[in-house]
Amino acid sequence: MGEPAFTSFPSPPVLGKLKRNMMPWALQKKREIHMAKAHRRRAARSALPMRLTSCIFRRPVTRIRSHPDNQVRRRKGDEHLEKPQQLCAYRRLQALQPCSSQGEGSSPLHLESVLSILAPGTAGESLDRAGAERVRIPLEPTPGRFPAVAGGPTPGMGCQLPPPLSGQLVTPADIRRQARRVKKARERLAKALQADRLARQAEMLTCR
């Protein structure tokens, strides 16, 4: 009797050797973008912040830690600044001088000169009194004074300005009067809308 023939069966595939990625391509791309953004955020947090208010050009800010030997590095011209400013623009404004229409240099206007233009009688008062008291300007034009024209101030003409709204007192009677006006306006609007609606309905019926 002969020996039985040896039959071999194929072995199952080894799963450990398969390195196939089962993640979809779109999800994998989104994961890579998220990881790159997180890496950039970590790198940005480790760097010093940039100051944008003290100068037009960006420069790093000195970090101040609670240590007695720490000193803030600054320039000599910055020691009197109360808050960061745009120093370049500030210096350009300091270099500018007001000029007249003929090109001649003129001194800047002070508060007293402005008050003398608006109300000639208040030029000699002190600034505290001028700030505390409201300047009363008459609404009616006085003889010899004319209202300002739209083209600009004319030499020899006075300036007529309305009184400031902050100086007018609002009474309960004014509030009630305004409420009555609003109510009447709403009633007129409701009547007009109703008449318009009826006219439209009548027009639609006639068109049919």
Swiss-Prot record:
It holds the Pfam family MBD_C. Keywords: Repressor, Transcription, Transcription regulation. The keyword Transcription regulation applies. It comes from the Eukaryota. GO terms for biological process: DNA methylation-dependent constitutive heterochromatin formation; negative regulation of transcription by RNA polymerase II. One of its GO terms (cellular component) is nucleus. GO terms for molecular function: methyl-CpG binding. Signal peptide: none annotated. The keyword Transcription regulation applies. Belongs to the MBD3L family. The MBD3L proteins are encoded by strongly repeated regions of the 19p13 chromosome. The exact number of functional copies is unclear, and some of them may represent pseudogenes. This is Methyl-CpG-binding domain protein 3-like 4. It comes from Homo sapiens (Human). The lineage of its organism: Eukaryota, Metazoa, Chordata, Craniata, Vertebrata. The gene is MBD3L4.
